[in-house]
Structure formats: structure tokens, C-alpha cells
């Protein structure tokens, strides 16, 4: 079997071109069985050490991860009916295996024996942390529960894994399930050339004439921002805001209503089973924040600081619309459009006119120049690597001693059958192997930008540049780690509310004149962003800053409060919670038929359940960390080395607050965030 199955015994990088749906389940079954056998085998030993117990377990789990990682990645970037089915059928197997491990008394006792052994005192910080985390995770997998309750735990976890996947599929299908063809260009007045060309290319790819629009962000956003045709904006908003729900043009077709209810009900049951009062308490058991009240207070405090300014920003927008356009009522599909007009009126700048200054190669070489200056790390493209699509590129990161530190796949463009958004995921983690050698980490960096059109290179908006830098921040956290214990290397073991620190930190340079000098360069002439455009860009940075942060707070408070108070007996709780949160924080009145929760994948299909607050929580850390660069010089290699050594290389081996204090010399303060966000005191 292993002869013909490329997922078995992967050495090095995944053989993407050889992986077929029929390989998936047999490989997963075989590898899970190997893992079970190894566990039973190592437990027969009379005495447990790191070498005879942890390392063999790490190796066999690694073989399973190495097969599953490319499969899970393909499910996100090259989704097909066959692949989806193969992926789905493995979820219960993986879930059952992970529950079996988490409730294995023998394994638990072996970890406990290690913790209580004489050798434990000599272990490294990372080794100790990995063992302590494992013991905590046993507790959170129900190791102490009765057999009956353990079985129920397993059922819940397996069902949740299925539901998360179903939620995600519904959103993808609903996004792909709506399109609009427009033949008359006159109906598209105001749309920038790049958006028209992309829509034309999209139509041609389907053998159609005219302009094809979809609900993918590169297609949807330009219409909402620039298109004069209000009816089209409303139609697209309606389709987008009701995806995967019982409302809108595809009402009921891919409806997530029941999926969400069941997810929330099961999460509450899971939390209570493990002895917590609410799912938020369970969520925080592995996070930096100490208790639910601390998170709610943090979010409420930020909302209080931002709301008056948000109201003022909206009044200014309304005043502008009335004065310039005689418009007195703003619907949700008008906000983006008129905000863009107001922004141009105030700052004479728009995202579109900056695109020519951010061609793909210039932006990427600028990003690499930055990490060379601050971290002394070089990025070098490696050709001939097997990938899942011809547009995917592959790079190595090399340090000042010519050591390979890590590598990554870069997949930048939106295409069909690829889930939306931008993300970093790990392909291979850093670890010390049984033979003593070090495995270097590999990451996937995925975005959804417009591909090159005609003979022009891909041209990014400034917002997309920031997104790329953000994901690259996650990437270097994973790739530059110096921890050899895989459970706490890179992003492993990093509390969820601290994981956004490096990513949000990297965004800062996208707003610095000295950095933009080499991140930008006109695709025809190579000249960097002209001074006056740069000045306007920086002035416009905090345009509607409070309205933006209030939108983030709306998501964060909704997620946390919903998980904090959800009660399966009550009906309509999801929409009622959203309504009450909106009345607390939102300045823009929504419409009753909008269904944002139904496509809120972060909390129903991603890892952000009762954790969406993490973005803002970590931004307090990242803004304050960056303020040290502002004080000492934004390319200061000494400050850079300190950030690399104290934070990036440490992975999850120590508590984030300790690492932060080591870098900053004190606890984090909120002021830098408010200043960066343009929230006035």
C-alpha cells in the first residue's frame, strides 16, 4: 500500500501533485493505527524518559500530521466534491483518535510520572512547559470523568468537528452559489479599471460576454466601494449579508441557522461536562486572559472609549452626504460608497490609485528587505517545488550564519474552489528528531488577491499589502522559532489571545515612510510612492478609525457574550444577542434581514470561539511592542534582535506576558493602541 500511497511516509515536502482523494482515508486509517500501536508500545516500558517516551510519540504523531496537513490545506485551496468527501470521512476518525489519546489513563499516568520524576528538574523550560500543557490538555479532554461522561465527551467533540466543517462548506457554497452578469458597461459607472478587467476576465473564463461579479472579496468590495449603481450595490449587499442563511436570494439553500444552534448547544454541554459554568470559561483555560469578566471589561472599556468618536465620524459622513449629494438616509450598502467619496474629498486619495505602486514583486522584495534589516534574515526563492497550483511560489529563510531557518509556500491569488480570506497555516513544525537532527519548519501563506490581468503584474491595494505583512508575521513566528520541542515550537502552545502579536506587529511598517520607500514602486517606472500620495495615505490612515474599531468590538463582544450566556432553551438567541450588542456599540443602524453570524467562520468553523477578542487583546501587545521601535528606530537591528530573541524564537515555551515584559521592560499599556488607532482621549 505504501508504495502507491504518497501520503504514507512523507519525507520532506508534501508531494502535492500526487495526492488524490482515494489516498486520503486509507492513509489516515493506517497512520492512526500506527500511532495507537506506538502508544501501547512505549507504555510497556518500566521507566519513562524524554528520549524513550516523548520523542517516539512525537515522531509517530508527526507522520500523521504530515499526511493530514496537505490534505486539510488542499481542502481549503483546491476544494472539490471528491476531496471534500474524503476529508469529511476522516474527521470522525481523527476526532475519535484525539479523544482516545486525551482520555488514555496510561498515557496520562506516564506524563504524570515524568512530571514527578527526578529528571524533570533538569529539563529545559520548553520541555517542562510541554509536559505541563499536556497534563492540562488531559484534564480538558475529560481524563477525570466517569466512563459514561468520557464517552459523551467523545461524541460531542466528533459532532462539533463535523459541524464546523459543514458550516465552512455552507459558506463556501453560498459564496460560490451567487453570481451576476452585467453586459452593459454603463451600469458599472465608478468602478475602477482593475475591477472592470477582473470582471471581464471572470466572464471570459466561463465563456460569457460582459462582466461577471461574485461574492468573493476582490469582486464584491470594489462594487460596494466605487460603483455608482445603487441598485447593484443593494443587490450584492443583500446576497453577501445573507449568505448561508434563511434570508436573501438563496434563502434556505445552504442555511447555517441550525448548524450554529447545535454548535453552541454542544459547546455549552462540553463546558459543563468538564466542570466549567460557561463555554467562555473553558475557552479561557488555555488563554492569557484570566477570566470572562476581564475580557468583557476590556471590550466594554474600549467600546466606551471609541463610541463617542464613532458617533462623531458618522455625523460627519452624514453631513457630507447631505451637503454634497442631498442624501439624507444612508443604507448599509451606501456607507462604504459614500465613505470612500468623503475620504477622497478629505484626502484626495483612494486605494485604487495606489495599486500601480504596489506590484507583487516590489511588495514581496520590500517585505524581504524589511526582515533582512530588522532580523538579519534573507529570503530566497526555491524553484521546482511540487505545489497545488502553478501560481504558488516557494521560499527559504536563511539566517546570518547561512543556516536554513524555515520555508514557506506563497499562494496569493483568489480563485474558485479556494476559501476566502487570508491565513497562515503550518505544514511542518520545528522539532528535534530521534536521531538528534533538527527538522526545519515550513508554512503555508495564503491570500485572496486579484491575479495579474493581461500583461500587467498583480497590483495590490495598500490594504492588501498590510494583509500580506500580517500573515507573514504569523509565518515568521512559526518559521523562526528556536524551540526544538514540537508542542511548544513556533505557534504551537501559544495562547490564542497572544498569537496575533507578531502578525499585527508586522503591519506597522506598512505605514512608515522609510519602509514604504522600498515596499512601493510603480510597476512601469519603479518610482516609490510620491511624497504627496504618501502624506495623504498616512493622513487617511485613521479616517473612520473609531467606526472600524467599533465594528471589531461588535464581533468580539457578540462572540464572547453569545458564548457566555447561550442557553439552548431560549429561541432566537443568536440574533437577539447581536441586536443587543449592536445597540451597545454600533453607530451604524443595520437591517433586520442581514445575517452576519451565518458566515462568521472565525467562531463557528475556525479557532476563535469565545476568542475573537484576541485580535484586539493582542493588538494592545503589538502596538506597545512596536512603540519600542518608534523610540529606538524602526530599522534598529538591536531592537529587532531583541524582538526576535525574546518573542519570535520562543514559541509557546513561556507565558506571553513574561516574554512581553522581557522585550518591553514592563507590562503592556493601552495608550499605544489608542494612539495607533487614532482614538483620541
Swiss-Prot record:
Enzyme category, top tier: hydrolase
Stored Pfam families: Peptidase_M3, TOP_N
Gene Ontology molecular functions: metal ion binding; metalloendopeptidase activity
PROSITE patterns reported in the protein's UniProt record: ZINC_PROTEASE
InterPro entries, A to Z: M3A_DCP, MetalloPept_cat_dom_sf, Neurolysin/TOP_dom2, Neurolysin/TOP_N, OpdA_N, Pept_M3A_M3B, Pept_M3A_M3B_dom
Catalyses which reaction(s): Hydrolysis of oligopeptides, with broad specificity. Gly or Ala commonly occur as P1 or P1' residues, but more distant residues are also important, as is shown by the fact that Z-Gly-Pro-Gly-|-Gly-Pro-Ala is cleaved, but not Z-(Gly)(5)
GO biological process, one term: proteolysis
The family this protein is said to belong to: Belongs to the peptidase M3 family.
Protein purpose: May play a specific role in the degradation of signal peptides after they are released from precursor forms of secreted proteins. Can cleave N-acetyl-L-Ala(4).
Name recorded for this polypeptide: Oligopeptidase A
Protein encoded by which gene: prlC
Amino acid at each position: 500500500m505504501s508504495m502507491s500511497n504518497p501520503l504514507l511516509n512523507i519525507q520532506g515536502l508534501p508531494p502535492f501533485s500526487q495526492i488524490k482523494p482515494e489516498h486520503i482515508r486509507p492513509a489516515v486509517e493506517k497512520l492512526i493505527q500506527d500511532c495507537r500501536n506506538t502508544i501501547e508500545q512505549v507504555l510497556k516500558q518500566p521507566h519513562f524518559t524524554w528520549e524513550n517516551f516523548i520523542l517516539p510519540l512525537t515522531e509517530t504523531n508527526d507522520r500523521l500530521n504530515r499526511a493530514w496537513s496537505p490534505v486539510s490545506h488542499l481542502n481549503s485551496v483546491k476544494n472539490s466534491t471528491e476531496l471534500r468527501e474524503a476529508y469529511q470521512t476522516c474527521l470522525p476518525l481523527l476526532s475519535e483518535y484525539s479523544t482516545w489519546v486525551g482520555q488514555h489513563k496510561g498515557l496520562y499516568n506516564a506524563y504524570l510520572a515524568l512530571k514527578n520524576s527526578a529528571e524533570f528538574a533538569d529539563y529545559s523550560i520548553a520541555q517542562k512547559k510541554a509536559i505541563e500543557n499536556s497534563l492540562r490538555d488531559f484534564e480538558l479532554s475529560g481524563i477525570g470523568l466517569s466512563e459514561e461522561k468520557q464517552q459523551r465527551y467523545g461524541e460531542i467533540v466528533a459532532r462539533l468537528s463535523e459541524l464546523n466543517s459543514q458550516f465552512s462548506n455552507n459558506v463556501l457554497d453560498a459564496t460560490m452559489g451567487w453570481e451576476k452578469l452585467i453586459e452593459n458597461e454603463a451600469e458599472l459607472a465608478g468602478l475602477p479599471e482593475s475591477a472592470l478587467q477582473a470582471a471581464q476576465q471572470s466572464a471570459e473564463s466561463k465563456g460569457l460576454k460582459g462582466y461577471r461579479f461574485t461574492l468573493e472579496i476582490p469582486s464584491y468590495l470594489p462594487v460596494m466601494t466605487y460603483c455608482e449603481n445603487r441598485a447593484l450595490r443593494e443587490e450584492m449587499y443583500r446576497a453577501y449579508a445573507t449568505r448561508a442563511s434563511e434570508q436573501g436570494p438563496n434563502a434556505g439553500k445552504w442555511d447555517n441557522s441550525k448548524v450554529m444552534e447545535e454548535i453552541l448547544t454542544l459547546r455549552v454541554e462540553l463546558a459543563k461536562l468538564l466542570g466549567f459554568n460557561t463555554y467562555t470559561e473553558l475557552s479561557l483555560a488555555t488563554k492569557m486572559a484570566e477570566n470572562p469578566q476581564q475580557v468583557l471589561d476590556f471590550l466594554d472599556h474600549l467600546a466606551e472609549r471609541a463610541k463617542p468618536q464613532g458617533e462623531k465620524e458618522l455625523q460627519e459622513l452624514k453631513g457630507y452626504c447631505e451637503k454634497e449629494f442631498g442624501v439624507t438616509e444612508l443604507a448599509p450598502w451606501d456607507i462604504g460608497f459614500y465613505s470612500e467619496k468623503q475620504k477622497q474629498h478629505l484626502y484626495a486619495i483612494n486605494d485604487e490609485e495606489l495599486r500601480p505602486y504596489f506590484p507583487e514583486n516590489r511588495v514581496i522584495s520590500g517585505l524581504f528587505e524589511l526582515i533582512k534589516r530588522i532580523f538579519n534574515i534573507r529570503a530566497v526563492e526555491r524553484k521546482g517545488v511540487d505545489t497545488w497550483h502553478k501560481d504558488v511560489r516557494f521560499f527559504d529563510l536563511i539566517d546570518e550564519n547561512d543556516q536554513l531557518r524555515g520555508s514557506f509556500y506563497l499562494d496569493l491569488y483568489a480563485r474558485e474552489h479556494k476559501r476566502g480570506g487570508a491565513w497562515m497555516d503550518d505544514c511542518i513544525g520545528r522539532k528535534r528528531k530521534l536521531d538528534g537532527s533538527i527538522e526545519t519548519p515550513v508554512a503555508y501563506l495564503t491570500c485572496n488577491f486579484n491575479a495579474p490581468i493581461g500583461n500587467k503584474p498583480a497590483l495590490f491595494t495598500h490594504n492588501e499589502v498590510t494583509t500580506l505583512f500580517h500573515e507573514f508575521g504569523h509565518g515568521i513566528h512559526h518559521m523562526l522559532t528556536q524551540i526544538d520541542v514540537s508542542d511548544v515550537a513556533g505557534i504551537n502552545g501559544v495562547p490564542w489571545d497572544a498569537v496575533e502579536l507578531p502578525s499585527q506587529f508586522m503591519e506597522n511598517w506598512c505605514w512608515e515612510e522609510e519602509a514604504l520607500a522600498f515596499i512601493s514602486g510603480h510597476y512601469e517606472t519603479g518610482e516609490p510612492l510620491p511624497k504627496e500620495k504618501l502624506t495623504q495615505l498616512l493622513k487617511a490612515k485613521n479616517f473612520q478609525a473609531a467606526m472600524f474599531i467599533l465594528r471589531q468590538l461588535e464581533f468580539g463582544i457578540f462572540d464572547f457574550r453569545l458564548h457566555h450566556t447561550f442557553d439552548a432553551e431560549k429561541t432566537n438567541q443568536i440574533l437577539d444577542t447581536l441586536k443587543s450588542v449592536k445597540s451597545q456599540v454600533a453607530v451604524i443602524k443595520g437591517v433586520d434581514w442581514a445575517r452576519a453570524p451565518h458566515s462568521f467562520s472565525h467562531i463557528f468553523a475556525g479557532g476563535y470561539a469565545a476568542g475573537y477578542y484576541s485580535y484586539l487583546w493582542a493588538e494592545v501587545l503589538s502596538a506597545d511592542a512596536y512603540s519600542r521601535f518608534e523610540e529606538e528606530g524602526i530599522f534598529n537591528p538591536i531592537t529587532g534582535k531583541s524582538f526576535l530573541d525574546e518573542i519570535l524564537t520562543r514559541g509557546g515555551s513561556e507565558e506571553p506576558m513574561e516574554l512581553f515584559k522581557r522585550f518591553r521592560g514592563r507590562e503592556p499599556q493601552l495608550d499605544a493602541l489608542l494612539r495607533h488607532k487614532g482614538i483620541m482621549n
